[in-house]
């Protein structure tokens, strides 16, 4: 199945991740990291809860739980102005989470390109997503994500 048509289901956990084109850098300084998180909060937090994340110079990982169907519907109606007439295709309620994540990635990429006078894609497309289907997998994934930076530094406290 094409990952682009894979629906992110309400009340389910997912591993969301991506990397720079050809493994290239997506964060050059602290301001980039902070802006990335600000955009994540703006676009993704309204539709998901976050359980873990890791931002690395060339990639990122998030463990998220999609909010309930009722919460997503409330967001879609009140924030995205979803109506019966425009509730189809990419604008359908079942696509609201993917759409918000795509807006987040696009907003960060456009800003990064403007700041660094570059053009074209910054991140591989589409963003990667994997449904977390067990508590054991969730626990191991959170450990993996939190330990990801230790490969860069011997002492994680200085990362």
Describe each PLM feature range:
Residues 1-159:
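Short catalytic/metal-binding and nucleic-acid-binding patches
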